[in-house]
Amino acid sequence: MLSVYSDDHRLHFGQSELVDGKLQPCFEMPSRADTVLARVKSQNLGEVIAPKDFGREPLLRLHDAAYLDFLQGAWARWTAEGHSGDLVSTTFPGRRLRRDGPIPTALMGELGYYSFDTEAPITAGTWQAIYSSAQVALTAQEHMRQGARSAFALCRPPGHHAGGDFMGGYCFLNNAAIATQAFLDQGARRVAILDVDYHHGNGTQDIFYRRDDVLFASIHGDPRVEYPYFLGYADERGEGAGEGCNHNYPLAHGSGWDLWSAALDDACVRIAGYAPDALVISLGVDTYKEDPISQFRLDSPDYLRMGERIARLGLPTLFIMEGGYAVEAIGINAVNVLQGYEGAAR
């Protein structure tokens, strides 16, 4: 299986995040991708290539131009005002505040407009890192368009919490959605996205919620007790043309392979019935039993079984890296999914 990777991910590294009332080093750190890359190489998964540059146009298919301009220029504006630390929002358009404009012109106001939490710090290298992460996804997608049955986009920062015009949860650009749209623009009639990250892919859901050319299925922690709290419930089935194309599987804290795999089986049945031309996997491995910010109980061998079950769908499959914060195990678990898939797909 071909993997696509860029060293540019190291340009983004937030100084700290607020966890349980305390500032601590960010869980979303460069060593995550470095560890996965090392495992890809040690297991001889296949060739590793650098991304091509497809420009901003594929990003603009889903992300607002003003939002991209903001992300690209925010750090320069921040430092021009005399600041040096991470740029993090502190004010958001909550209940009974205006959300439909006008967009504030002050930097902190505009940042709050485009953010839904404090977990997406902008640093000096953030734009280049997130831009390259999207190009990683697009390069892997192009490899599949040229005939490959699978590919792995080792994206960092992750993307599934990012919407068309908002960021949060470590995410700025939605890599999985961008690659999905590229499949459609190049002739696919339908594409399915299966999000196996511990946290609900609220950004991906929002982007495709009213469309019938993308089926979205997500297996995640119950939002009643788990981030992102305000989306990811089972009754969210899509709207308008997209009604019936959104499937959420919220699971309780402590869920292990038995409950998780039952949800996977149901999601796979729905995906098979949808008959997509391609499948995109938002590959988060923060479902691992020792992940520091998650509450599921999957073990490393379970990720082999996950890949095997996905392979039985018999679909061209693009894997896009999302979460996973147990750094010592992230490479083993992510590559186990890929090896499980490859072993069953032969």
Curated annotation (Swiss-Prot):
Residues the UniProt record annotates as site (Polarizes the scissile carbonyl of the substrate): 325
The keyword Metal-binding is annotated on this UniProt entry: yes
Binding site for Zn(2+): 197, 199, 286
Gene Ontology BP annotations: epigenetic regulation of gene expression; polyamine metabolic process
Pathway: Amine and polyamine metabolism
Gene3D superfamilies assigned: Histone deacetylase domain (3.40.800.20)
Assembly with partners or alone: Homodimer.
PANTHER family linked: HISTONE DEACETYLASE 8, HISTONE DEACETYLASE HDAC1-RELATED
This protein's name: Acetylpolyamine amidohydrolase 1
